[in-house]
Amino acid sequence: MSLHHTSPTPIAAAVLTQLAAIAGRWPSPKVRRLHIPRRPGEPGEHDAEFCAIELEDGAFGLSYILLGHTLDRLLAHHGSGRSDALADADPMALAQRLADGDEVERAVALAAVNALTDSVWRRVGYTPPPAGNSLGDVVLGPQDHLGMIGFFPPLVRRVDEAGGRLTVVEMNAGMVARQQERFPNILVTLDRAALAGCNTVVGTSTMLLNDSLDEMLAAAPAAQRFAVIGPSAGLWPDALFDRGVTLLGGTQVVDGAAFAAAMAAGESWSGASRKFAITRGSWPGWRQIAGL
């Protein structure tokens, strides 16, 4: 029996409606700055690059920026060395572009959504549960047929160790070719219909940027567990849980100065952050957390 639900409201609209309701109780601070990583040295050298919005209260929100030419355009518009990019901007206004913006606007919008979420969580004293493993508490056994949306090399090893089956759905042909070369024994495809037989699905939060989450949920009717994980998954989870997502695994920045320095230097910022995992069954709901 599928755990999925259907919702007529586009996910971006649901997220923005929720943010507006929360902002009535918890007005948002302005943007302190947009953090952009140093440009990758060679095409394909980095599989994951993120930008971050920092708010004046020290809250952070992350977003993936390797879709299309997002990174190039962000660098052209703001430059990784600019210390005042988007300073004093209204994060609620930036967030609105999640619904109808271009690839750059949507990336910045998701970072703003995540920063707004982090800001309220900090103010109300909510700390999301720590992730028990690097993949958002996803536990696998030999009976599992895992579907991956986007590529998680650590999960490939974990499936192999557990003796389970693995199907990978990628979102661009270039990544399919690269991953098939790296892992020739794994099915890597652009066809989301390949998820039909998977009982567990793990997808990157990039699905929020390219608006593919609802399509992927529909393509995996047998999935009893559907996790959305990654640094971009730092938002209130209600809209995702309403659709059938069972786990949200995100990243919180815990040392803003160290994070900013690492991103500016093109170094790993994992030591300045913590991974968390929120399950649908344990989530009390946004109204209770926000005191609404």
State each model region's role.
Residues S2-E161, I278-L292:
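Electropositive, gly/pro-rich neighborhoods at or near active sites that engage anionic ligands
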Residues S134-L135, N185-G197:
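Short acidic low-complexity segments
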Residues F152, N172, S232:
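Residues in the short beta-alpha loop(s) of Rossmann-like NAD(P)-binding domains
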Residues R225-L292:
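C-terminal functional extensions of proteins
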